[in-house]
Design a protein with these regions (language model features):
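Structural signal for conserved beta-strand scaffold positions within catalytic alpha/beta enzyme cores
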Residues: 51-52, 76, 125, 149, ...
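Switch/connector loops and helix/strand junctions flanking conserved nucleotide-binding motifs
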Residues: 84, 157-158, 184-188
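Short, solvent-exposed amphipathic alpha-helical segments in soluble enzyme
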Residues: 90, 164-167
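Active-site ExK catalytic segment of metal-dependent nucleases
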Residues: 145-155
Length: 208
């Protein structure tokens, strides 16, 4: 109903601000269950308000059918909505590109998620409960699964390297990292500036 939809909507910014961005219904209402809120999330998605990013059971092809519909992140379909829901001081800081704090990673991830959806990609992520291995997004090509990492800082990408180099993930041979920097490639990790996110699918389709 309307109240539940609004409660989910209002919870998106604070939940994106956390390190673990998996959407938790327990933060929406005490005792909330997925089956009771499934319709609310579907309504927000169908209305073009949110993009749902599902957690893969395992990082391998195919993507469809290989995810847990009860584990997901919610991003805004328009990053402007996320910015508009920040407090006034945070909006001023954003325009000045300073003091972004906990929302820095959320903003970059939301921008990339929005760009991927608008270029025709579905949204999937991976996080193992029993380890630190996690990846922000995955995009598929005809023969490969490509992990996409969004870095708010130009730090090392341990999970991305593990996915590329481990024999356990045979569908993954290279990865993409979106950063505040230039185009490059080191150890099968291709880096692109954030603003190139909308070109990811086109780049992968043309890559030999």
């Amino acid at each position: 109903d309307q109240t539940r939809i609004l409660n989910v909507f209002d919870q998106i910014p604070p939940q994106l601000s956390r390190d673990n961005k998996k959407f938790q219904l327990s933060k929406v209402a005490s005792g909330a269950r997925f089956k009771d809120y499934r319709g609310c999330i579907e309504w927000l998605k169908d209305a073009g308000i949110v993009n749902v990013c599902y957690c893969l059971n395992f990082p391998e092809l195919p993507l469809k059918g290989n995810y847990d519909e009860t584990k997901y992140k919610l991003y805004f379909a328009d990053t402007g909505l996320l910015v508009a829901m920040l407090d006034e001081e945070a909006q001023v800081d954003l325009r000045a590109n300073k003091n972004l704090g906990v929302y820095k990673g959320a903003l970059y991830e939301n921008i990339v998620g929005e760009a991927l959806v608008k270029s025709g990609c579905g949204l999937y992520y991976y996080k193992r409960d029993d380890s630190t291995l996690e990846e922000d997004f995955f995009v598929r090509t005809a023969n490969n699964l490509v992990p996409v990492e969004v870095k708010a800082t130009n730090s090392k990408s341990k999970s991305l390297s593990t996915l590329i180099n481990s024999e356990k993930y045979s569908d993954i041979t290279y990865g993409l990292k979106l950063i505040n920097g230039n185009v490059g490639c080191v150890n099968n990790i291709y880096t692109f500036p954030y603003f190139c996110a909308f070109l990811v699918k086109k780049y992968l389709s043309q890559r030999k």
